[in-house]
């Protein structure tokens, strides 16, 4: 407390900013994931763990060859890579400027497993499908410890992790990705890429998801047919236009919620969340009118969060300032004590 006594004010490092742990809107590309990647090797297996701190997405996988490791790094395009300093890396990876060596103990399997149990509040990892992937567990635990060390705060929005298997998708090597010009064209123009042609998404969240799908084409025919049927239902009933129009008013809720969880949200994050929640009743009504299994399941799971919206509606001014220190964030009438100031 600055006013508690005389003498110098105690200063502490409250956060260490690194390329892979950015969450600020102004520092991120809203249509690209900002990934922190951890790499660990155990015997002949390579473990990878990728975290998008700005969105709360956490996934792991385990591969058996250096070629597969490099291919996954090429696909993920992480902003930062941390590696076990005791591991001998492939030459191409060792020269990567995004690389940061970390102590070997950070990736030790038992401590990493405990780190994950503590983060998720579980006794084991069987429910996540990674219990038999020790190299991936080491990478995931090391990554969480690194983030805890740099952010100096809890990570309540990291509630789960998913396991990715290369057998679930088409495997594209670096040369194939370049030749197909998925997201980078030889001309340097995004419009000349597959993403540039296909991306008509209404939200930043949708844009990021589309890029993940393009870079990891599924092989599961049942899932693909389900998505195709869903798209057909939207077009046949001419519902996609109205849904698209509603979604265009939606803020980047995924990243806003992460900033709220990390206690770094700004006033306009809260107003953006409020305005986005206001769209849910209309979206729910539109989705409920469509006879499609995938859309019906989505509609059934949609929570309008009426209580949260009501709180933000009465607590936050219509157009709050960018920074909290500028004042004028809390709406008149919400807190009598503030109204008197």
Identify the role of each PLM range.
Residues 1-233, 241, 245-261, 265-341:
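Charged catalytic and DNA/RNA-contacting regions of genome-maintenance
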């Amino acid at each position: 407390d600055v006013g508690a006594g005389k003498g110098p004010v105690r200063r502490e490092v409250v956060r260490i900013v690194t390329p892979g742990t950015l969450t600020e809107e102004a520092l991120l590309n809203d249509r690209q994931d900002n990934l922190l990647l951890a790499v660990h090797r155990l015997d002949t297996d390579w473990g990878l763990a990728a975290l998008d701190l700005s969105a709360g997405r956490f996934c792991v996988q385990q591969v058996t060859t250096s070629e597969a490791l490099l291919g996954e790094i090429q696909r993920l395009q992480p902003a930062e890579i941390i590696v076990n300093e005791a591991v001998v890396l492939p030459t191409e990876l060792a020269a990567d400027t995004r690389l940061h060596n970390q102590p070997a103990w950070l990736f030790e399997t038992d401590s990493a497993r405990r780190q994950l149990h503590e983060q998720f509040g579980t006794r084991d990892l069987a429910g996540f499908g990674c219990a038999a992937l020790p190299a991936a567990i080491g990478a995931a635990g090391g990554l969480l410890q690194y983030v805890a060390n740099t952010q100096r705060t809890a990570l309540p929005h990291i509630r789960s992790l998913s396991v990715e298997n290369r057998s679930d998708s088409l495997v594209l090597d670096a040369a194939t990705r370049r030749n197909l010009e998925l997201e980078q064209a030889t001309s340097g123009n995004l419009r000349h890429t597959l993403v540039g042609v296909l991306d008509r998404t209404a939200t930043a969240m949708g844009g990021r998801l589309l890029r993940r799908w393009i870079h990891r084409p599924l092989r599961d025919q049942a899932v693909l047919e389900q998505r195709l049927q869903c798209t057909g239902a939207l077009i046949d009933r001419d519902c996609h236009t109205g849904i698209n129009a509603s979604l265009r008013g939606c803020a980047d809720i995924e990243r806003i919620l992460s900033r709220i969880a990390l206690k770094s949200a700004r006033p306009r994050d809260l107003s953006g969340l409020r305005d986005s929640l206001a769209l849910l009743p209309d979206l729910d009504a539109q989705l409920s009118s469509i006879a499609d299994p995938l859309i019906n399941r989505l509609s059934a799971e949609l929570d309008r969060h009426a209580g949260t919206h009501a709180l933000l509606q009465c607590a936050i001014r219509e157009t709050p300032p960018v920074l909290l220190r500028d004042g004028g964030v809390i709406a008149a009438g919400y807190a009598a004590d503030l109204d008197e100031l």
